[in-house]
Amino acid sequence: LCGWNILNFDLPIILRRSWALGITPTRLLDFRRYSTTTTIDLMQILYNWGNSPGPRYRGLKEVAKMYNIQNDFPNLDGSDVATMDEETLIAYCRNDVRMTRELAMRTRGYYWK
């Protein structure tokens, strides 16, 4: 499982919601720092879990730009999600997934196998 900031945002929300609904996860995930056994959090890895000098973390779009990864929605961010129509929301989410995947493919072999 690979994502951007998934250890601090996406997965805790999904797990708490699953717990509230009585849905047991189909597999257990490794939330330990510095581990890439079951979960690869690209933000944590690229910024050494907040231990790098300089800015503690940067957003996916900023990092994608540094790696010359195309962003089809440069003027939108997560704060705009509530006002997006369904078609734009789907395209926005697909764009984030594509950027994350491309970033993962470019960094593979440097931080994990």
What residue ranges belong to the model's regions?
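Metal-dependent phosphoesterase core characteristic of DEDDh/y 3'-5' exonuclease domains
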Residues: L1-A91, N95-M99, L103-W112
